[in-house]
Amino acid sequence: MMEIPKVNNVDASKAEEVKAAITLGFTADPLIRWIFPDPQKYLRSFAVWMDEFSKPSFENGGVFADENYYGGSLWHPPGIHLDSEILAPTFADIPESRVEHALQFFDELGKYHPDEDHWYLAFIALDPSKQGQGLGSLILKEALKIVDEQGKIAYLESSNPQNMTLYERHGFETMGRVEFGDSPPAHPMIRYPK
């Protein structure tokens, strides 16, 4: 019988492990790879995204990972909002024909963020070799315990339609669908406290 891995709230001493797992998990993400189709540019720019998105998560107890660091999640607590300008240096890695649609895309997604205090799931992903084994669900469940204890809303944007049933099983509801030009869709999703 397979042993159930432990999921923990982790600190910045494990930043590289968590960011590596998430980076691996997004290598085939439809939206992220539409934004960064070139492999080298993906690795370079996604590293910037991981650095910027993980800072507030580590600073505020919003990082969850399994004990082997095959997967992780980055949550931003209520009151934390990243300025999209910090990602501007990565825009040069977006194909020129997609820049305008990508910027429209992010602008439209931003309109779905709840006005109420909420926890924002910026990223959750697993090493692809560990997907489909329930690990993502364990990581999500551990974080949602804290969100529920605080009586807060949880919000995310699903950039991969294959993941939507996972989120729905954990109580998330689809708020809409965002796409521009030939971009893959993203689905903003919200979950009210249980």
Tell where the protein language model's regions lie, with residue ranges.
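Conserved acetyl-CoA-binding loop-helix of GNAT-fold acetyltransferases
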Residues: L126, G132-K145, R169
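Conserved beta-hairpin
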Residues: F58-S73
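A short beta-loop-alpha structural element at the N-terminal edge
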Residues: K6-A20, L24, A28
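Conserved active-site alpha-helix within GNAT-family acetyltransferase domains
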Residues: S137, E149-G151, N160-R177, G181
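Active-site rim helix/loop that mediates acceptor-substrate recognition in acyltransferases
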Residues: P39-G62
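C-terminal "cap" of GNAT-fold acetyltransferases
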Residues: K152, L156-P161, F180-K194
